[in-house]
From Swiss-Prot:
One of its GO terms (molecular function) is rRNA binding. This protein binds specifically to 23S rRNA. It makes multiple contacts with different domains of the 23S rRNA in the assembled 50S subunit and ribosome. The globular domain of the protein is located near the polypeptide exit tunnel on the outside of the subunit, while an extended beta-hairpin is found that lines the wall of the exit tunnel in the center of the 70S ribosome. The gene is rpl22. One of its GO terms (biological process) is cytoplasmic translation. It comes from Pyrobaculum arsenaticum (strain DSM 13514 / JCM 11321 / PZ6). This is Large ribosomal subunit protein uL22. Keywords: Ribonucleoprotein, Ribosomal protein, RNA-binding, rRNA-binding. Pfam families: Ribosomal_L22. InterPro entries: Ribosomal_uL22, Ribosomal_uL22_euk/arc, Ribosomal_uL22_sf. The keyword RNA-binding applies.
């Protein structure tokens, strides 16, 4: 059963974050939030996706995650990359990447929710930039995995609480391209 949640960032903290990152003062009316509690997906992959989409516009993030679902573009892995394959990457910087399809689908649903929240507040969807995205561990769903000879091993399923905060920014400070520098081959 989902627990009560309050966003980890207040509107004042979001405004301060936007001022530090972009040098623009915004009001609480220019902020849109979305929250997805207790999602059954990988916490580690959720952190990587949240880190990657922070700073993108809403349309850029949706386009990139749709390509992840189609296995056309990967998400660079920065933290949890021990024993991961290093690819001859078509981008500069991070040779370790994954295609977290399940996580990308859940984030696409959340971005759709965020876009609807922004439109409800009267924000221009083309100027909405993701300023904060976070994935927090949720509660564990107890499960049992049957083993040989009548034994059983506890195998808990993890859940993730995901929140995304976006703000409507002036056109001058909106990022124009993705973070990965794609190499033409």
């Amino acid at each position: 059963m989902p627990r009560h949640h309050s966003y980890s960032l207040s509107d004042e903290k979001v405004a301060e974050l936007v001022f530090r990152q972009y040098g623009v003062k915004i009001t609480p009316e220019q902020i849109a939030k979305a929250y997805a509690p207790e999602q059954r997906m990988s916490w580690k992959k959720s952190i990587e996706v949240a880190r990657f989409i922070t700073g993108m516009t809403l349309k850029q993030a949706k386009a990139w995650l749709e390509d992840v679902v189609k296995l056309k573009r990967p998400i660079p892995i920065k933290t949890y990359k021990k024993k991961q394959a290093h690819h001859a990457a078509p981008w500069r910087g991070w040779p370790v990447a994954k295609w977290p399809v399940k996580v990308a689908r859940r984030y696409l649903q959340l971005l759709e929710n965020l876009e609807n929240n922004a439109k409800f507040k009267g924000l221009d969807a083309d100027r909405v930039v993701i300023v904060y995205a976070a994935a927090h561990k949720g509660y564990r769903i107890p499960n049992i995995m049957p083993r040989a000879f009548g034994r059983a091993t506890r195998f808990d399923e993890q859940t993730v609480n995901v929140e995304i905060v976006a703000a409507e920014l002036p056109k001058e400070v909106i990022p124009k391209r993705y973070k990965l520098n794609l190499v033409k081959r």
